[in-house]
């Protein structure tokens, strides 16, 4: 999972770690390093981060491995941003704050493809 807010990483990690092995990054550069090194099965990616734009990170991730499903997340509820994330290769788009049960459902759906 990639998010610049440690609180979000902590919430997701605590919730998802019972089912999945979870690795996190707080910025796009580190996330790309982890994708290169570990080839994760699924990525939760904050689209609105400082530094490298989340959409640019998504595009770079898809160049590294187009088969890895990416679920785009952000505080901004914006249909244009959601559409752009999907256009760039995101499996789905999910606004913060999270409904953790639905997030689990999205993860399972993405991994079953």
Over which residues does each language-model region extend?
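Acidic catalytic/metal-coordinating carboxylates
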Residues: 27-30, 53-56
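Active-site beta3 strand of CheY-like receiver
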Residues: 38-44
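Two-component/phosphorelay signaling modules centered on CheY-like receiver
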Residues: 5-23
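Receiver (REC) domain active-site loop signature in two-component systems and cognate sites
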Residues: 49
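Short, conserved "switch-loop" micro-motifs in signal-transduction and mechanochemical regulators
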Residues: 76-77, 88
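C-terminal output helix
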Residues: 80, 98-107
């Amino acid at each position: 999972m990639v998010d610049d807010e440690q609180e979000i990483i902590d919430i997701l990690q605590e919730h998802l770690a019972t089912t999945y092995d979870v690795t996190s990054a707080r910025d796009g550069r580190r996330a790309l390093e982890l994708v290169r090194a570990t080839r994760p099965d699924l990525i939760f990616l904050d689209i609105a981060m400082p530094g490298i734009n989340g959409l640019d990170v998504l595009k770079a991730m898809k160049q590294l491995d187009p088969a890895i499903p990416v679920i785009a997340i952000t505080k901004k509820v914006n249909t244009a941003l959601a559409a752009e994330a999907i256009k760039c290769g995101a499996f789905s788009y999910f606004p913060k704050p999270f409904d953790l049960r639905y997030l689990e459902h999205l993860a399972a759906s993405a991994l079953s493809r």
